[in-house]
A protein has these predicted regions:
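Conserved ATP-driven motor cores of ASCE-family P-loop NTPases powering translocation/secretion/packaging/pilus
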Residues: 54, 60-136
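Conserved structured core elements
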Residues: 20, 44-47, 51, 74, ...
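Mechanochemical coupling/switch segment within NTP-driven translocation systems
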Residues: 1-20
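Alpha-helix capping/termination and helix-coil
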Residues: 1, 5, 30-33, 61, ...
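Switch/coupling sub-region of P-loop NTPases
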Residues: 1-3, 39, 43, 52-56, ...
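Walker B catalytic acidic pair
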Residues: 24-26
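N-terminal, helix-rich and Lys/Arg-enriched segments in bacterial and organellar proteins
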Residues: 18, 34-37, 49-52, 63, ...
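Flexible beta-alpha connector loops of hexameric P-loop NTPases
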Residues: 28-47
Length: 136
């Protein structure tokens, strides 16, 4: 939780709860390709709010988890991308790895046949767990 929220929680009987906003395929939410003017205005408002949360949210205990197949500058604006503290990438070519992690580690450290394997911006490689639907 952000420093300001922690300080607030130490001085009140009703602490702020963490809020986590998760969006899988954020590209679907922000892509302006082929959008008419009305839709572009709506998307600009959404982008503006996400940008504000990315910049200031941690101080209030609000966190973003945004996922997309290809987070290029046309989909996730730099203002949002630069304020995302933690990045994770699966197997990717060097261009995509550079976009996500600012390095080519996803290309170099994740084998092509490794399914469910990811690397963090700090270079930590980890394996995701495969859930069998019968187990759920």
């Amino acid at each position: 939780m952000g420093e300001n929220a922690q300080q607030y929680n130490e001085t009140t009987e009703q602490p702020l709860q963490r809020l986590i906003f998760t969006c899988d395929e954020v590209a679907e939410m922000l892509d302006k390709t082929g959008a008419d003017n009305e839709r572009k205005k709506l998307l600009a408002q959404i982008e503006n709010k996400l940008s504000t949360i990315a910049r200031q949210g941690r101080a209030f205990g609000i966190h973003l988890i945004l996922a997309t197949q290809r987070p290029d500058a046309t989909i996730i604006p730099g203002q949002i991308r630069n304020n995302m503290d933690f990045r994770v990438c699966g197997r990717a070519d060097s261009v995509l790895s550079q976009i996500i992690l600012d390095n080519t580690n996803a290309t170099e450290q994740i084998p092509k046949d490794a399914r469910g394997r990811f690397i963090t911006g700090d270079g930590i490689v980890f394996q995701g767990y495969l859930f069998d639907e019968g187990q759920l």
